[in-house]
Structure formats: structure tokens, C-alpha cells
Amino acid sequence: MNLKRISEAKLPTPWGDFLMIGFKELDKEQDHLALVLGDISTDAPVLSRIHSECLTGDALFSLRCDCGFQLKAAFKQICEEKRGLLIYHRQEGRNIGLLNKIRAYALQDQGADTVEANHQLGFATDERDFTVCANIYKILDVKAIRLLTNNPEKIKILKKEGINVVQRVSLIVESNPNNQDYLSTKKNKMGHFFKK
């Protein structure tokens, strides 16, 4: 495993107080975060979200995607249970990087959908590697998870990596006129679920 736990600190949020744990992928010099609420060391399945970094949605409040809305909803759902884990997966733009994401946005402005834009730039539909997230679960000794996701690929990869995903929990947020085509593409071309 090429992942190391580096440091931790308290992180108060509007929804609750988390323990923020920093990890580093040693071969890629890439950092990731685990935000822990409550005791996740028991055998009871942990409500968990793997949230891939989206600077435009998470920090700049973009309406082009549902990422920022999903992040807030995940924090809220975890805090309602008073126990959970949010992994902030630092693979921006489905792991094509911020500048390539801006290039993909420009192609979308010209009529391409999110999948077509990635392909036109020479990338796969989704370049993310969720094995690093599986390794975070293992380092934190999480026995079983209830995964907050609409993405069946996350579940498939985590199970393949030996993570006990006992339930998929829907993460449904409101759409808006700016992201309806994006959400439709995620459903129709990427197989995402959008029903509870």
C-alpha cells in the first residue's frame, strides 16, 4: 500500500465537528482527506461518502454540476446520524485535473456533453482511481460501510478491493437549469442512479 497517514486535526463545520485526517499517496505526491464523525471503529456499518474533488462546485458554487450540493447533503446526512466518514478524494474533474476540466467545460459550451468532452480531450469517461479510497477504509479499520452514492462503479471497485459495502444510500439533490443535461448524461451514459 503506497498510502501514508500523515496528520490529523479537529475540523468544525456548520453541520458538526469532524476529525480531519490527512493521507498522502507516496508515489503520486497526492493528498487525500478523511473526515470522521463519531466512533467508526465498531462493527456497525458506517455511513460514508467518497467525494471527488470539484473546485468549481465545492468552492466556487458552480451550478454546472451537482458536486457542491452533494457535498453539503453528505455532511448533513452524516451529522444527522452522529457517526460517519467522508473521504475527500483529491482527483479533480474525474481525475483529468482542473485545467483540463476548464477545457472540457469549453467543449460543453460548444454542445458536447461531459462524456463527449472528456473523449475529445483524449481521456476516458472517468479517470478516477477509487483504490486509494479503499486503502483509506483499510487504514482506518472500517469494517463495513453504507455508501452515499449514485455511482455503481464506486461500489463495484470498493467491493473488488475487499471493502464490505452493505448498502447503497441515495444522494439525491435538486437539479437546476444549468446542470440538467449533465445529470442526464451521468444517468444515461455513466449508469448513475437518481432514484431513492
From Swiss-Prot:
Query: From the UniProt record, which GO molecular function terms apply?
Result: GTP binding; GTP cyclohydrolase II activity; zinc ion binding
What cofactors does this protein use? Zn(2+)
Q: How is the cofactor bound?
A: Binds 1 zinc ion per subunit.
Residue positions binding GTP: 49-53, 70, 92-94, 114, 149, 154
Q: Which residues form the active site?
A: 126 (proton acceptor), 128 (nucleophile)
What does the record give as the reaction this protein catalyses?
GTP + 4 H2O = 2,5-diamino-6-hydroxy-4-(5-phosphoribosylamino)-pyrimidine + formate + 2 phosphate + 3 H(+)
Query: Annotated pathway, please?
Result: Cofactor biosynthesis; riboflavin biosynthesis; 5-amino-6-(D-ribitylamino)uracil from GTP: step 1/4
Q: Which UniProt keywords apply?
A: GTP-binding, Hydrolase, Metal-binding, Nucleotide-binding, Riboflavin biosynthesis, Zinc
Documented EC number(s): 3.5.4.25
One cellular component (GO) term of this entry = cytosol
Where Zn(2+) is bound, by residue?
A: 54, 65, 67
Q: Which domain of life is it from?
A: Bacteria
**One Pfam short name:** GTP_cyclohydro2
**Keyword Cell inner membrane among record annotations:** no
Classification via InterPro entries: GTP_cyclohydro_II, RibA, RibA-like_sf
One GO BP: riboflavin biosynthetic process
Protein family (similarity comment) = Belongs to the GTP cyclohydrolase II family.
Its biological purpose is as follows: Catalyzes the conversion of GTP to 2,5-diamino-6-ribosylamino-4(3H)-pyrimidinone 5'-phosphate (DARP), formate and pyrophosphate.
NCBIfam families assigned to the protein according to its UniProt record, in alphabetical order: PRK00393.1, ribA
Q: How does it assemble?
A: Homodimer.
Protein's UniProt name: GTP cyclohydrolase-2
Organism for this UniProt entry: Hamiltonella defensa subsp. Acyrthosiphon pisum (strain 5AT)
